[in-house]
Amino acid sequence: MSISKAIAADLLEIKAVSLSPSQPFTWASGIKSPIYTDNRVTLAYPEVRSQIEGAFAELIKTEFPEVEVIAGTATAGIPHGAIIADYLKLPFAYIRSKPKDHGAGNQVEGRVAKGQKMVVVEDLISTGGSVLEAVAAAEREGADVLGVVAIFTYELEKANSKFADADVKLATLTNYSELIEIAKETGYVTKEELELLKKFKENQETWQA
């Protein structure tokens, strides 16, 4: 089994990802979805966490070999980013969703030199808006952001377009396609539910159970 599928299987097993095609979730954006993800759950499982961070380290070495500093997004990207930085023996920083309203007013916390090559760590990519705002904040403070890594992506077309428009490279450990394939192979969903899950990938904006 590939590392991508192995991680997808782990996310299902520990219920970091929940699938409910017949009784969909409603995201904050208003999108009706057959899937809900809370990757913070992975932190409670040492073996899963270790596999994720090791896979992240290998992914970064392959996709972004020039990296000089790891940055996590607040708050979900911080624990993963800190562990990855330790794996890679690199400096770590984190990026707030907005600047502090007191003190120095920092948005990027830590020491990042002008032109330092950075990879930003996020746990989940949905529409991509928040992590791209973090990338922009890091770049305003002088970082040279090589790209973004994440555990999981819903593969929304909106996110793909945003990353393309921003000219930011995205690399993830696993994705929606791999996850529903694993769900099928393990009997996690019925044939009818699988079809609903596939339809969501084809058109998330208009999908209905």
From Swiss-Prot:
GO MF annotations in UniProt: magnesium ion binding; orotate phosphoribosyltransferase activity
Reactions this protein catalyses: orotidine 5'-phosphate + diphosphate = orotate + 5-phospho-alpha-D-ribose 1-diphosphate
Cofactors, names only: Mg(2+)
Pathway listed: Pyrimidine metabolism; UMP biosynthesis via de novo pathway; UMP from orotate: step 1/2
Enzyme Commission (EC) number: 2.4.2.10
Chain coiled-coil ranges: none
Protein residues bound to 5-phospho-alpha-D-ribose 1-diphosphate: R96, K100, H102, E122, D123, L124, I125, S126, T127, G128, G129, S130
Binding site for orotate: S126
Record key words, sorted: Glycosyltransferase, Magnesium, Pyrimidine biosynthesis, Transferase
Protein origin, superkingdom: Bacteria
Self-association and partners: Homodimer.
Function according to Swiss-Prot or TrEMBL: Catalyzes the transfer of a ribosyl phosphate group from 5-phosphoribose 1-diphosphate to orotate, leading to the formation of orotidine monophosphate (OMP).
UniProt family annotation: Belongs to the purine/pyrimidine phosphoribosyltransferase family. PyrE subfamily.
Protein's recorded name: Orotate phosphoribosyltransferase
Native source species: Lactococcus lactis subsp. cremoris (strain MG1363)
